[in-house]
């Protein structure tokens, strides 16, 4: 306890206890924070005695800083505490933790700039993975397993979508041809795509050999041979030769050249894996403009065209392939509108309010079409006729003429139209009484039968007709003539 408490004393301890944990906060650093920091250093297998000097704090900072991205909250708190303690030893007069961290970052940036400037003055390349060792020699550091794992994960998750190319470019920064071949060899699947990539590399290597022919005669002593296309691809050159080419004077950036060939092949693969043309990207009738823009630029990244052509596609096709609602808005903005202005103007298109407005307009158009169809209907309208006055255009209930007495049908008094016994006219326009034979649209006489009467076999009793029926039948059917004249003596 005593040793840990003796890290600071006197004026430094007073300055330590004045520093705030957070900007504008009430809590301040105390002795217990130093005791906790020394215990944490022991847990991380570091010497707590390093906290007693500014040089020791600087060593702890260099040791802990690479682990901040993946470290726990305790590790970050320990780093912050050591950074504040470092400036207490320096008598820098910091007031809170954030100020100490900002000051530390500023110092590290200045130190890095000085290192890069000194390396540039000496003509030494600092590109990873070729670095300079303590003896001043340029050595190669292999790609870390974490870098290779990130590349394999991108291929597995994204296949060969357009975002694979910038990811490859970032992971292969400063790499040698050997490193680039290592990245390509880690791709397990997609062998058809890898074969396409090899074909592109071979074509570019042959083009390099054509444009850079080998000079006749042996190379001058002390001078390296010029790289061939296969040397740039890493198949006929060693790692040491690649390093010498990349760090020579003048340098030959074989890594960057090979990387450019690979990206050219990846562009062809992305094009194959993204068969959709930019001309086919059109906004759906209910699709939000933001989703349409996302799809448009994703396919545009896969297009093998210059930046000027892509700019023309953006200015022309983005508006041309929008749906009618967005197209109307975009044309009103004019040709000089930025993408931000377009997305802001079309923000509500496709949303609930816009859908309701479009639905209301569609229903209004449908109703107007129905009304026009009704107005154009050429069928005859039903004529309304008044039973009271006999005029057309109104009914009896609305008639202003004096009320007619009696039946509206026959004109007689004593009954209403619903009780009228007068027959209506048939479809021939003739009225027939009910007691004067058959209706006028039926035959008034029947043809006389020529067959003999049916024989009776005694299966049922004959029905005796009534006198009235006989009289009626006598009127309708006159007696038949004798049939003896027809059949002679036939019994």
From Swiss-Prot:
Region (PPIA/CYPA-binding loop): 213-221
Region (Interaction with membrane phosphatidylinositol 4,5-bisphosphate and RNA): 14-33
The keyword Lipoprotein belongs to this UniProt entry's keyword annotation: yes
Family annotation (Gene3D superfamilies): 1.10.1200.30, 6.10.250.390, Human Immunodeficiency Virus Type 1 Capsid Protein, Immunodeficiency lentiviruses, gag gene matrix protein p17, Single helix bin, Zinc finger, CCHC-type
GO BP annotations, alphabetical order: viral budding via host ESCRT complex; viral translational frameshifting
Residues bearing PTM Phosphoserine: 144
Residue span of region Interaction with Gp41: 7-31
InterPro entries the record matches: Gag_p24_C, Gag_p6, Lentvrl_matrix_N, Matrix_HIV/RSV_N, Primate_lentivir_Gag_pol-like, Retrov_capsid_C, Retrov_capsid_N, Retrovr_matrix
One Pfam family matching this protein: Gag_p17
GO cellular component, one term: host multivesicular body
Keyword Metal-binding: yes
Zn finger limits (CCHC-type): 384-401, 405-422
Region of interest: Interaction with membrane phosphatidylinositol 4,5-bisphosphate: 73-77
Remaining remarks: HIV-1 lineages are divided in three main groups, M (for Major), O (for Outlier), and N (for New, or Non-M, Non-O). The vast majority of strains found worldwide belong to the group M. Group O seems to be endemic to and largely confined to Cameroon and neighboring countries in West Central Africa, where these viruses represent a small minority of HIV-1 strains. The group N is represented by a limited number of isolates from Cameroonian persons. The group M is further subdivided in 9 clades or subtypes (A to D, F to H, J and K).
Protein name: Gag polyprotein
Organism: Human immunodeficiency virus type 1 group M subtype F1 (isolate VI850)
Gene (UniProt): gag
């Amino acid at each position: 306890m005593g040793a840990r408490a003796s890290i600071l004393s006197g004026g430094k301890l007073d300055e330590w206890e004045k520093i705030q944990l957070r900007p504008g906060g009430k809590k301040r650093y105390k002795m217990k924070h130093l005791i906790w920091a020394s215990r944490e250093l022991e847990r991380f297998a570091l010497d707590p005695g390093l906290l007693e000097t500014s040089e020791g704090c600087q060593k702890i900072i260099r040791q802990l800083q690479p682990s901040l991205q993946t470290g726990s909250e305790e590790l970050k708190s320990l780093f912050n505490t050591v950074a504040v303690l470092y400036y207490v030893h320096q008598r820098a007069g910091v007031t809170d933790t954030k100020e100490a961290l900002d000051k530390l970052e500023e110092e590290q940036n200045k130190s890095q700039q000085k290192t890069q400037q000194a390396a540039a003055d000496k003509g030494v390349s600092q590109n990873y993975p070729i670095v300079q060792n303590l003896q001043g020699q340029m050595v190669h550091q292999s790609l870390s397993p974490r870098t290779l794992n990130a590349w394999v994960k991108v291929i597995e998750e994204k296949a060969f979508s357009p975002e694979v190319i910038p990811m490859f470019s970032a992971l292969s920064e400063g790499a040698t041809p050997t490193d680039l071949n290592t990245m390509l060899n880690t791709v397990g699947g997609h062998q058809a795509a890898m074969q396409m990539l090899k074909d592109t590399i071979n074509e570019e290597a042959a083009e390099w050999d054509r444009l850079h022919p080998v000079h006749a005669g042996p190379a001058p002593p002390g001078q390296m041979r010029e790289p061939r296309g296969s040397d740039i691809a890493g198949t006929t050159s060693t790692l040491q030769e690649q390093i010498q080419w990349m760090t020579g004077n003048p340098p030959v950036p074989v890594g960057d050249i090979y990387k450019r060939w690979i990206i050219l092949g990846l562009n062809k693969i992305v094009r194959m894996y993204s068969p959709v043309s930019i001309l086919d990207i059109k906004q759906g009738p209910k699709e939000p403009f933001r989703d349409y823009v996302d799809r448009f630029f994703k396919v545009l990244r896969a297009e093998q065209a210059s930046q000027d052509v892509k700019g023309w596609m953006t200015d022309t096709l983005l508006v041309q392939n929008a749906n009618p609602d967005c197209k109307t808005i975009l044309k009103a903005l004019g040709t000089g509108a930025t993408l931000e202005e377009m997305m802001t103007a079309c923000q509500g298109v496709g949303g609930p309010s816009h859908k309701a407005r479009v639905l209301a307009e569609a229903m209004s158009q449908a109703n107007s079409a129905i009304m026009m169809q009704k107005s154009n209907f050429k069928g005859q309208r039903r004529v309304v006729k008044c039973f009271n006055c006999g005029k057309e255009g109104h009914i009896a209930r609305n008639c202003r003429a004096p009320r007619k007495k009696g039946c509206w049908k026959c004109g007689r008094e004593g009954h209403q139209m619903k009780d009228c016994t007068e027959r209506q006219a048939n479809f021939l326009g003739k009225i027939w009484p009910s007691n004067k034979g058959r209706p006028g649209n039926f035959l008034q006489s029947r043809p006389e039968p020529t067959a003999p009467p049916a024989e009776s076999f005694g299966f049922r009793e004959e029905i005796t007709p009534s006198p009235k029926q006989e009289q009626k039948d006598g009127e309708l059917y006159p007696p038949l003539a004798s049939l003896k004249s027809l059949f002679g003596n036939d019994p």
